[in-house]
């Protein structure tokens, strides 16, 4: 029998110390990794519930195990809520991650060796969109499109590649692109060659839910997303569709289970349900609007300080700082900013001469700091501090001064109070 009197810090002090240190880091450092955010305490409460104990292979009402009547309620709540959030008529909330959701779509709709057309990782796409190091680039014949000299998707070039290679699937979505995507144009390109249009909206799902970024739901055959990032839920994935026929729905359902997954993570699905309820609240739209305002304030400030932003600015939650030609690499900049308690990630930029392990870019995002309560002026200040560090990454005095300023700012906006 378990004892409620035993605490983690006494039973496993090594692990407890690591968890406490990470909690402290999240409070004391500014989080600018575009794919990270903070879950609400309610989301974490659901994820830490007894639902973690339950096996529930199958779907609500059609399980392979007994005792699923209550986890069925949790999963159905998640399904119904996410359909309402995005205006979908099909939703699968079981994928363990965005990458698994993408894998499910490929395996449901394609055969090994089929041609896919996706955005190059080096130009802002994602590993799972056909990168050679990923299964999507090994199982399928992956053709890649990129951005032009202005850092924008060249839709005429995408059309040319589609016409030339006749892909069975066109993939739209990104991990490092700061402008709005013309989903209708992508659908027209896909239709012109008889291809599926698959949209991975993982990075902008929260913005889409709030109506501050165009929705792909009326254009794509199938849509996937993560449930963290801008959606601000637990780490996980979802698959959505609108107007999908019965055959497509059956393929998607059966490929998730039993195709590539067994038992779903019911505690995570419960946490997803909480996050989806939060996404339906009026405050969520206000939050997403502020995410974009904050990103634009940061981008404009960095531009004013002489730093190049790929595509010239941002219309979403992120920006890509291009440092080609500068002495500092993305790797060195990430390390220097880390010493100043500013957490970012190095990132390749279009036509990057440095390796992906070094890079000439930084990806910055505002979802996490906006959750803390940051406003535009806070982001102007923060962007100036970032520029100060990038101007003098080896100057310990500058790093110390910025670290002190960041510490004071973090105390002003605690994550969990």
Curated annotation (Swiss-Prot):
Annotated positions of the N6-(pyridoxal phosphate)lysine modification: 229
One Pfam family per UniProt: SHMT
- Which metal ions or organic cofactors does this protein require, according to UniProt? pyridoxal 5'-phosphate
Q: Which residues cross the membrane?
A: none
GO function terms (MF aspect): glycine hydroxymethyltransferase activity; pyridoxal phosphate binding
GO BP annotation list: glycine biosynthetic process from serine; tetrahydrofolate interconversion; tetrahydrofolate metabolic process
The record's EC number reads 2.1.2.1
Q: Gene3D superfamilies from the xrefs?
A: Aspartate Aminotransferase, domain 1, Type I PLP-dependent aspartate aminotransferase-like (Major domain)
Q: Give the enzyme class.
A: transferase
Keyword field: Amino-acid biosynthesis, Cytoplasm, One-carbon metabolism, Pyridoxal phosphate, Transferase
Family, as annotated: Belongs to the SHMT family.
Q: How does it assemble?
A: Homodimer.
The job of this chain, per UniProt, is described as:
Catalyzes the reversible interconversion of serine and glycine with tetrahydrofolate (THF) serving as the one-carbon carrier. This reaction serves as the major source of one-carbon groups required for the biosynthesis of purines, thymidylate, methionine, and other important biomolecules. Also exhibits THF-independent aldolase activity toward beta-hydroxyamino acids, producing glycine and aldehydes, via a retro-aldol mechanism.
This chain belongs to the protein called: Serine hydroxymethyltransferase
Please give the organism. Xanthomonas campestris pv. campestris (strain ATCC 33913 / DSM 3586 / NCPPB 528 / LMG 568 / P 25)
- Highest classification ranks of the organism: Bacteria, Pseudomonadati, Pseudomonadota, Gammaproteobacteria, Lysobacterales
Q: Which gene encodes it?
A: glyA
